[in-house]
Design a protein with these regions (language model features):
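Catalytic machinery of carbohydrate-active enzymes
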Residues: 1-213
Length: 213
């Protein structure tokens, strides 16, 4: 069974949606997972054992309608059985439509019936866990009977990357036995970035409470 998961967005969204790939692999025997993401975001997906193939959506597909049409036709050649559209924008809707898959799943919107035959209401209220995680898990409800309430996404490193990271920590005298926090202070745009003074105070509080490095 071939399954296409579509998540065209920034690195954080691409990483988060790998939980869909993981849950599919763990619950559907012998499924083959193809993950369609924007080029430039693949670093957080490489080495992931739950992703069989990465399909890159290139900038030229946005800029050139003919190249986008060629890409759409190439999607049909994969003969996907199921498409899960996490992105739910015009491009991904067309990709879903051209896929020819018998099961097409996404969130419920006014025009969803034109592109999908399974639509899931988008949760607006937090139920004691990350809302972004919950909404992604809900997309699997037509396929998986028992779903977890929460799950964490992971980055999988190869041996050389692990060695490089260990050398970096040793060079900067960071104790690997103590908690290590990696915090990004910049969002993907200005309106998704906290004020620097506020972020500086937040980091200080995290460091003082958690005894992290």
């Amino acid at each position: 069974m071939k399954i296409l998961v579509i998540q065209q967005k920034m690195i954080g969204d691409v990483l988060t949606s790998t939980i869909i790939c993981e849950l599919l692999k763990k619950n559907i025997a012998s499924c083959e997972i193809h993950y369609l993401i924007n080029s430039g975001t693949e670093a957080v997906v490489q080495n992931n054992p739950f992703v069989d193939h990465i399909i890159l959506f290139k900038p030229e597909f946005k800029e050139n309608k003919f190249k986008f049409y060629q890409f759409l036709r190439s999607i049909r050649d994969y003969q996907f059985d199921i498409v899960i559209d996490v992105y739910r924008k015009v491009e991904s809707k067309l990709i879903t439509l051209f896929s020819g898959a018998s099961k097409k799943i996404s969130y419920k919107k006014l025009d969803s019936f034109l592109f999908y035959n399974w639509t899931i209401p988008y949760l607006k209220q937090d139920h004691n866990s990350d809302l972004a995680i919950q909404n992604r898990i809900q997309l699997l409800s037509p396929l998986v009977d028992q779903l977890p309430s929460s799950i964490s996404s992971k980055i999988y490193l190869n041996d050389s990357e692990i060695l490089e990271a260990n050398l970096f920590l040793e060079k900067h005298q960071i104790n690997k036995l103590s908690p290590i926090y990696m915090i990004s202070v910049l969002g993907s745009s200005l309106n998704k970035t906290y004020p620097f003074d506020y972020m500086a105070d937040t980091i200080k509080k995290i460091a003082s409470i958690g005894k992290g490095q």
